[in-house]
């Protein structure tokens, strides 16, 4: 019998991703990107809960079950409200007792 996983609600996933982003961004983003993010976030910033992609294995080298993870993007929106400048993509496990996360940072 498979264990039923209680999925993260979007607001919780967004909060987790944003907290981790703020803590780790200085070590993983260029200073110019951090400055851009800080200057533009209030006007154009977004933290979005998106459908979990099934190609994370290409990014992290491990196959994952998209049903067991939430995906959150942090970036800036353009004038069409599309996120065209993604600073980080987060993959966060739904398992509260063993929370894993992976991050793909802007290069």
From Swiss-Prot:
Q: Cross-referenced SUPFAM superfamilies, in alphabetical order?
A: Putative dsDNA mimic
Task: Read off the Pfam families from this record.
Answer: DUF440 (PF04269)
What does it do?
Answer: May act as a double-stranded DNA (dsDNA) mimic. Probably regulates the activity of a dsDNA-binding protein.
Record-stated family = Belongs to the putative dsDNA mimic protein family.
This chain belongs to which protein, by name?
Putative double-stranded DNA mimic protein Asuc_1259
């Amino acid at each position: 019998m498979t264990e039923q996983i209680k999925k993260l609600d979007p607001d919780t996933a967004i909060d987790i991703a944003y907290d981790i982003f703020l803590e780790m961004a200085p070590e993983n983003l260029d200073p110019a990107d951090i400055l851009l993010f800080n200057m533009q976030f209030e006007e154009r910033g977004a933290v979005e809960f998106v459908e979990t992609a099934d190609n994370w294995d290409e990014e992290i080298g491990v196959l994952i079950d998209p049903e067991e993870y939430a995906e959150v993007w942090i970036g800036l929106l353009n004038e069409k409200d599309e996120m065209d400048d993604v600073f980080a993509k987060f993959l966060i496990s739904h398992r509260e007792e063993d929370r894993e996360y992976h991050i793909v940072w802007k290069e």
